[in-house]
Swiss-Prot record:
It comes from Campylobacter hominis (strain ATCC BAA-381 / DSM 21671 / CCUG 45161 / LMG 19568 / NCTC 13146 / CH001A). This is Phosphate acyltransferase. One of its GO terms (molecular function) is phosphate:acyl-[acyl carrier protein] acyltransferase activity. Its EC number is 2.3.1.274. GO terms for cellular component: cytoplasm. Catalyzes the reversible formation of acyl-phosphate (acyl-PO(4)) from acyl-[acyl-carrier-protein] (acyl-ACP). This enzyme utilizes acyl-ACP as fatty acyl donor, but not acyl-CoA. The gene is plsX.
Length: 330
């Protein structure tokens, strides 16, 4: 049975929503949850009928958001450190944390370790599209300065994720650029373009709008650009939501129309809701590491755990290592 280490203290709202999400996941899937944090606090939120499916790991410290990422190596009593150590030791196959993302990445890379041939592990996230599908965007923040070789590797890892986790047999892969034409981009992306052409599913440059139109399954970029794209899209979605609500309230006719459109709004919200997938995997490290938002709801935590279970039951890491080895020898 898969064992998942859960950093119960890392989120912005304490352990309650994280444990609630864990219990919701236990209701639907078979796995053992290792809850890491203050046991006295955590026990309050675990129903008696689930006690046998949960293991408590005592942690006496919460790693603060104000800390530098690599400082976590000195905080061995922190919940995130202990959660990652459960994966490193082999007791758990996956870790889910809504805590300090930089600390989670540092621990995953330095303590769990990278897969063979992986230079830089990227964070991958699923972006909504107008077709109802998802575009995998990576890197969205792990590596702000990248070489062409790193971006090429992101393409290999993204393709593996699309095939093994998303179930897409022949995923279309693009590189984020300032135009679709082959000659567009900066020196790094142009060089990465040449390397990516070795992949049979590479289709070329992708403009920012193509993240959301469903024309590509995987889009790669460095973590600086990717994080800006991610945060910009979140900002636009939030602004549009506020604008629609503001305009609807101005007119009784608009309110009536909104009531009639309630089902449509619900579908749109579901397609664009972060809670539906719950977290972003850090690819290229041994085992599975899922990074969730600090403000994650119980639903987001539940779906992050589902991601971890699907990842742990797949062959994705073997595929990544084998594909990178193949390209290395070409």
């Amino acid at each position: 049975m898969i064992c998942v280490a859960i950093d119960a203290m890392g989120g912005d709202f304490g352990c309650e929503p994280i444990i609630e999400g864990t219990i919701d996941a236990l209701k639907e899937r078979e796995f053992t949850a290792f809850l890491v944090g203050d046991q006295a606090q955590m026990e309050k939120f675990v129903p008696k009928e689930f006690i046998n499916r949960v293991k408590f790991i005592q942690s006496n410290e919460i790693f603060e958001m104000k800390e530098g990422a690599t400082n976590v190596l000195r905080h061995k009593e922190s919940s995130i450190y202990k959660a990652v150590e459960l994966v490193r030791s082999g007791e758990c196959q996956a870790v889910v944390s809504a805590g300090h993302s930089g600390a989670t990445m540092s621990l995953a890379t330095l303590r769990v370790g990278r897969l063979k041939n992986v230079a830089r592990p990227p964070i991958a996230t699923l972006m909504p599209t107008s077709t109802g599908t998802r575009t995998l965007l990576l890197d969205v923040g792990a590596n702000v300065d990248c070489k062409a070789e790193h971006i090429f590797q992101f393409g290999v890892m993204g393709e593996a994720y699309a095939k093994e986790i998303m179930g897409i047999k022949e995923p279309k892969i693009g590189i984020l650029s300032n135009g679709e034409e082959d000659g567009k981009g900066n020196e790094v992306t142009k060089e990465a373009f040449k390397l990516l052409k070795k992949m049979k599913n590479f289709v070329g440059n992708a403009e920012g709008s193509q993240i959301f139109d469903g024309s590509m399954d995987v889009i790669v970029c460095d973590g600086f650009v990717g994080n800006i794209a991610l945060k910009s899209s979140e900002g636009v979605a939030h602004a549009m939501n506020k604008l629609i609500k503001k305009e609807v309230k101005k007119s009784p006719l608009a309110i009536a129309g909104a009531v009639l459109m309630k089902k449509v709004f619900k579908i749109v919200r579901k397609n664009t809701d972060y809670d539906e997938y719950g977290g972003a995997p850090l690819l290229g490290v041994k085992n599975c590491v899922i990074i969730s938002h600090g403000k994650s709801t119980p639903k987001a935590i539940k779906n992050a755990i589902f991601q971890a279970l699907k990842f742990s039951n797949s062959n994705i890491n073997s595929v990544i290592s084998n594909e990178l080895e193949k390209f290395k020898n070409e």
